[in-house]
């Protein structure tokens, strides 16, 4: 029977699983976002939140504990100086999982794990200017073509004068 066995095995040996999650949490904290399968994202979330909690503590022992798990010293520094101060008032829940659908190659459910207060770009504001009417687009193209024609003639007129000076 399955009692008190927390965590997912993910079809890997213990050493492989630990190494994979150490690499993933390092990449996640470095880029503040990671795309992976749903099962890995759910496991990575708990590890990443523990690392951010260590960063919030901020003492020497917490720094050493984080450095023992995170593979890159620059990422540990980023965790303690940039990431953790953002969440001083927040008592947990530093990450979110956004499900993307399935991966075409193997039909695996894929999701994005990202930090909650990361800067989000507004999607609707960028979409509205891109949808301009076709008539409005045609007029600037014609005007641009008219402007380019005189510019193209000017260098041609100067070219013979340049040749005459080189012949003389």
Swiss-Prot record:
<feature type="region of interest" description="Disordered">
    <location>
        <begin position="123"/>
        <end position="144"/>
    </location>
</feature>
<dbReference type="InterPro" id="IPR047859">
    <property type="entry name" value="Ribosomal_bL17_CS"/>
</dbReference>
<comment type="similarity">
    <text>Belongs to the bacterial ribosomal protein bL17 family.</text>
</comment>
<comment type="subunit">
    <text>Part of the 50S ribosomal subunit. Contacts protein L32.</text>
</comment>
<feature type="compositionally biased region" description="Low complexity">
    <location>
        <begin position="127"/>
        <end position="144"/>
    </location>
</feature>
<feature type="region of interest" description="Disordered">
    <location>
        <begin position="149"/>
        <end position="168"/>
    </location>
</feature>
<dbReference type="InterPro" id="IPR000456">
    <property type="entry name" value="Ribosomal_bL17"/>
</dbReference>
<dbReference type="GO" id="GO:0022625">
    <property type="term" value="C:cytosolic large ribosomal subunit"/>
</dbReference>
<keyword id="KW-0689">Ribosomal protein</keyword>
<keyword id="KW-0687">Ribonucleoprotein</keyword>
<dbReference type="Pfam" id="PF01196">
    <property type="entry name" value="Ribosomal_L17"/>
</dbReference>
<dbReference type="GO" id="GO:0003735">
    <property type="term" value="F:structural constituent of ribosome"/>
</dbReference>
<protein>
    <recommendedName>
        <fullName>Large ribosomal subunit protein bL17</fullName>
    </recommendedName>
</protein>
<dbReference type="InterPro" id="IPR036373">
    <property type="entry name" value="Ribosomal_bL17_sf"/>
</dbReference>
<dbReference type="GO" id="GO:0006412">
    <property type="term" value="P:translation"/>
</dbReference>
């Amino acid at each position: 029977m399955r009692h008190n066995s927390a965590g997912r095995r993910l079809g890997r040996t213990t050493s492989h699983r630990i190494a994979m999650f150490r690499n993933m949490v390092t990449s996640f904290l470095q880029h503040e976002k990671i795309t992976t399968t749903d099962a890995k994202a759910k496991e990575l979330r708990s590890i990443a939140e523990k690392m951010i909690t260590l960063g919030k503590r901020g003492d020497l022992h917490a720094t050493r504990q984080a450095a023992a798990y995170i593979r890159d010293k620059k990422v540990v520094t980023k965790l303690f100086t940039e990431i953790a101060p953002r969440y001083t008032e927040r008592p947990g829940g530093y990450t979110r999982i956004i499900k993307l659908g399935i991966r075409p190659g193997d039909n695996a459910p894929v999701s994005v794990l990202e930090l909650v207060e990361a800067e989000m770009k507004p999607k609707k504001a960028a979409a509205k200017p891109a949808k301009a009417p076709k008539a409005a687009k045609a007029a600037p193209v014609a005007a641009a073509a008219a402007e380019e024609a005189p510019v193209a003639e000017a260098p041609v007129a100067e070219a013979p004068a340049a040749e005459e000076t080189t012949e003389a």
